[in-house]
């Protein structure tokens, strides 16, 4: 880790990372990262990791119904720009930006993270309302590219849970899953040893650490913790070919994908390598796109 980052682990297993950073001024970025996503879903929960993410904005112990969004709007924050979340195969991350010039704003921000970590209420009325929102997100995402990827992923992720755990899930489960099935995922996987609180911004790091310890120290995991299922590695059994078509596709894509060993980004050197690789890919893409725009393009 960068020496300026303060890392700690609470007795309950929750990890926190604190980095004082004075640009932009008077701003604090607060994240809650959960080491669980759609890969951890049971067969009757496909799509519910993402649904759980939605429910975090629909009522908690301190902030009933949509009070989180309404409160943040009163201090100048906007949903989407300053308040957001996302779910992937392996993680669920909540992101919050608050002004740091007044202590109560940061305290409220940490209260929100604490409620997301262990006190989402799952009001049956709110669950019923949010089903339609999640189903509409599923419907709007069912374009040609998504349909092609769904087919391609069966080959790409062959032999692993990734092939059967696309994050948006299955509409019939989203539509019919009982409230308790949705809540079961939350209780199984939103537990301290699978969580990290990340605070970066223009604040006193000692005060921030004290407030994190005070708020998150009482979090408890389930009495009987489940073993966390991993996605597993796709089977590497020679060359596999996937040819997929869709009548609504607007172009042709040819890709070559290689299975390589995971390389963690655990140091500045690792991060520098990652940035260099990303820049290489961007430069190559721009050059190919520039060639493609020419009237005498060779492809």
Model regions and ranges:
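Active-site-adjacent, His/Asp/Glu-enriched structural segments that form or flank metal-binding
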Residues: 34-146, 173-177, 181-194, 204-220
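Short, solvent-exposed loop/turn segments at the edges of secondary structure
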Residues: 11, 25-27, 87-91, 129, ...
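An aromatic/glycine/proline-enriched structural segment found at the starts
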Residues: 159, 196-251, 263, 290
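Mature N-terminal segment immediately following signal peptide/propeptide cleavage
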Residues: 1-33
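Histidine-acidic residue clusters that define the catalytic metal-binding segment
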Residues: 1-6, 94-97, 151-195, 228-231, ...
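Soluble periplasmic/extracytoplasmic beta-strand elements of cell-envelope proteins
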Residues: 15-19, 29-33, 93-97, 196-198, ...
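Signal/transit-peptide handling
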Residues: 31-42, 46-78, 143, 152-166, ...
């Amino acid at each position: 880790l960068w020496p300026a980052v303060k890392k700690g682990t609470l007795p309950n297993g929750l990890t926190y990372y604190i980095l004082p950073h004075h640009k932009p001024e008077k701003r604090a970025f607060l994240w809650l990262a959960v080491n669980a996503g759609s890969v951890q879903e049971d067969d009757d929960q496909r799509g519910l990791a993402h649904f759980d993410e939605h429910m975090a904005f629909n009522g908690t112990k301190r902030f009933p119904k949509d009070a989180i969004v309404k409160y943040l709007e009163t201090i100048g924050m906007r949903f989407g720009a300053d308040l957001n979340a996302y779910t992937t195969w392996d993680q669920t991350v909540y992101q919050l930006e608050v002004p740091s010039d007044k202590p109560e704003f940061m305290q409220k921000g940490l209260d929100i993270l604490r409620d997301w970590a262990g006190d989402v209420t799952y009001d049956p009325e709110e669950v019923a309302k949010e089903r339609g929102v999640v189903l509409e997100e599923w419907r709007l995402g069912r374009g040609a590219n998504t349909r092609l990827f769904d087919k391609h992923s069966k080959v790409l992720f062959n032999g692993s849970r990734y092939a059967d755990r696309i994050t948006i899930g299955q509409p019939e489960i989203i539509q019919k899953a009982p409230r308790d099935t949705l809540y079961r995922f939350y209780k199984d996987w939103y537990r301290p040893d699978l969580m990290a609180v990340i605070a970066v911004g223009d604040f006193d790091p000692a005060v921030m650490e004290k407030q994190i310890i005070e708020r998150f120290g009482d979090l408890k995991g389930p009495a009987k913790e489940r073993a966390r299922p991993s996605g597993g590695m796709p089977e590497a059994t020679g060359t596999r070919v996937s040819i997929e078509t869709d009548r609504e596709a607007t172009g042709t894509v040819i890709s070559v994908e290689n299975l390589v060993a995971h390389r963690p980004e655990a140091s500045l050197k690792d991060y520098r390598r990652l940035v260099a690789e990303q820049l290489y890919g961007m430069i190559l893409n721009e050059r190919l796109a520039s060639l493609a725009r020419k009237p005498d393009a060779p492809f």
